[in-house]
Amino acid sequence: MCGIVGFTGNHQAAPILLDGLSKLEYRGYDSAGLAVRDGEHLSQVVKAKGRLSNLSEKTDSGKALKGTCGIGHTRWATHGEPSQVNAHPHVSGNCEKSGSGTVESEVVGVHNGIIENYTELKEKLLKHGYTFYSDTDTEVVIKLVDYYYKKYNLGPIDASAKTMVRVRGSYALELMFKDYPGEIWVARKDSPMIIGIADGETYVASDVPAILKYTRNVYYIGNLEFAKLTPGEAHFYDLNGDEIEKETTEIKWDAEAAEKAGFEHFMMKEIYEQPKAIRDTLNSVVKDGVIDFTDIDLTEEEIKKYSQIYIVACGSAWHVGVEAQYVIEEMAQIPVRVELASEFRYREMPLVKDGLVIVISQSGETADTLAAMRMAKEKGLATLAVVNVIGSSIAREADKVFYTLAGPEISVATTKGYSAQLVALDCIAVQFAKVKGLITDEQYSYYISELQTIPDKIEKILQDKERIQWFAAKYANAHDVFFVGRGVDYAVCLEGSLKLKEISYIHSEAYAAGELKHGTISLIEDNILVIGVLTQSKLYEKTVSNMMECKSRGAYLMGVTNYGNYEMEDKVDFTVYVPKVDEHFMGSLAVIPLQLLGYYVSVAKGLDVDKPRNLAKSVTVE
């Protein structure tokens, strides 16, 4: 949530900053701003409410701001309403123009995160003569830096360190000091930040896509660390002011993967990239026909000792966990608990000491998931992270990491990230079953080969997208939609429902089909859309029966089922068929039509598919 960028080098900064912010729009925002400095001249600050295009227009696409050092920000309101006044950057001076224009301030900065004790700090600063023009916690932090900088006559190192010790909460902070032209100072705690290095130029961003166009060599700044950035160099420090040695990491992602490549929206592009994401993820662990977790550092001895698995995640990643629970418990005969990270971290619950906590996060920065993992580690449990971003906070702190190879995912609504996570958990299920002696060599090979057929079968489903597009246009004005299924199909329904509601703004809910009669069926009325997922042969007739109850009350029925279940045509009003794969893995196929449905409904309604209202791609605050 929020996005930060920074640049110091030889080129004009503002166009680079605007380009970087455009690559972070998926994180969600309500306003944006830039601060650019030309040599020893004072910083120029420009801010705008609303879309990034408003800021671009104000600055003539950045050409109106001269200077080779600058910082930028897209804001998601947490303290103070969305407005130009509350937009970042903020300044340390007592400014009457909401911090815009040429600023006579010692410190200019932007911040991503939440400062929990900002009220206390604000009262302190008021007593020392500071006044405030905004309602934000960020202005408080900038003025706290200024306070230490001036009062103790400190340099940026000590002023930054004292500020970091004093504040409570999360932050990724960028600062420019009037007395230090060409330098950007950054600090981090629990909010994402990467630093990119190229020839004579240095970049800062919340996420990789913002700088991928310019460099692949990045530094990861650790918790409670700060850094001085100059053109082409970065120097890191701990809270004591001692310098820390770091090495760069090369980002392997293709720069073009962060572009639309001819698709109207990132979401559709990423739907089409799912076969590759799954192939790449499978190929990273399937070698010579067997699953090899050597790179994850997960040994057979460790697998044998785990008696309980906890899967902890948020949003779509939690849906992956729900589906994986069915597969792992049936295959590997290990009890699995699936927990929402935002609940798990606050529960006083007994945890099995020889349990394994699997945390799932596409970004590797999800605040609640990160906090839940830390809690599990404090209690002595082993942790395995399934993440997509190399070097992310969760990846760095987990005991073991299974990287999904989905590449950058820009659309807020996850598709390929979800699918890569799901196949990763399927691999874990198969390997655990094999190591525990619960499946034969023949079954093991069969399951692996079935997983390897999924990419081609997804491509076949995508060939039928026009029928789903037609159906989506027909129901684009629906007010309520219900998804029903059992077992793995229920998990698919959870994800399908979320896809529809988050990008089309239609109220939708997913229910275990057997629960309809326990209250939900009272909501069924004429022409309400009920979507059933029916891929599990043992549960097929039960779910059909539940759907018929809905039809008898006037519902319009859509069914998603396997090729071969052609009697479905006589029972529901619209049927989507998907290829067959082993039923443990059917969720990877059944979810595709539901992704397409959500996408096409949103398009039919003329909505912003990639950046739905009120949502952020990476939820990095609690």
Label the predicted regions:
Residues 1-260, 264-265, 276-307, 346, ...:
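Conserved short alpha-helical segments that host acidic/polar catalytic motifs at enzyme active sites
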Residues 7-10, 111, 131, 135, ...:
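Hydrophobic alpha-helical scaffolding
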Residues 72-93, 285-300, 324-360, 366, ...:
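Glycine-rich oxoanion-binding loops at beta->alpha junctions
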Residues 241, 556, 569-571, 581-622:
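Generic C-terminus detector
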Residues 274-278, 282-310, 400-529, 602-622:
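Active-site phosphate/pyrophosphate-binding segments
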Residues 304-446, 450-453, 533-579, 597, ...:
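Glycine-rich phosphate-binding loops that contact phosphosugars or nucleotide phosphates
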